[in-house]
Amino acid sequence: MIHILKGPFEKASRPLVDLLIRHHYTAFHLTMIAFFGTLLASILIYYQNWIIGSSLFMFFSLFDALDGSLARRNNSAKPIGAFFDSVMDRFSDSAILFAIIFYAFNTGKRNIFLLALLALIASLITSYIKAKAENFLEFGSIGLLQRPERVLIIFLMLLFPNYLLLGLWVLVIGGYITICQRLYSAYQKFNPQSFS
């Protein structure tokens, strides 16, 4: 859903991207800044510093969204860059959800612990399905909760921790719906090939 805003976001962020290019930042720099920023946010979340932690998480997630735009803007986009960015995104997603898992474990909140664990699995499997399918065919952006949607939900539930359980339910249900959507789409795309 949110991915349809990619074009307008890229256009609106162009002045900032140009500024970063003038100061010799590369897509790799932005990817690493976003990753370490998310690690910092995860530590703050673990210690229940919800407002600062969630704000930093969203800030660095938006920062991460600029790396592809910057690479395209200065004609430095390469497959290795997209690959590395995808890997670091998985580390970032895992870090923030692990922060919630450890917070729940230490505070004895079993429901939050279990749901955060299920949300982490859903996030990783969702990404894995696309990565694996794209080894064989063009897959595209498919599913109810892709990464931008997950980032927004995580930000909101961390900013308003009283709704943490609700946010995790949304992540879990939406995540497994997305897995089913991607599996079904992959089956449809693979099936004609199996009879060729």
Each predicted region: which residue ranges?
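N-terminal membrane topogenic signal
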Residues: 8, 24-29
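Ser/Thr-centric signal marking residues that sit
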Residues: 28-31, 178
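A feature for the membrane-embedded catalytic helix bundles of lipid/isoprenoid biosynthetic enzymes
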Residues: 2-17, 87-196
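Helix-capping/transition residues at the boundaries of transmembrane alpha-helices
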Residues: 20-22, 45, 71-72, 134, ...
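Cytosolic juxtamembrane amphipathic/interface segments immediately preceding
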Residues: 14-26
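Membrane-interface alpha-helices at helix entry/exit sites of multi-pass transporters
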Residues: 81-86
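Helix-loop junctions at the membrane-solvent interface of multi-pass transporters
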Residues: 24, 44-48, 99, 159-160
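Membrane-embedded alpha-helical segments that form the functional core of polytopic membrane enzymes
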Residues: 31-80, 110-121, 163-174
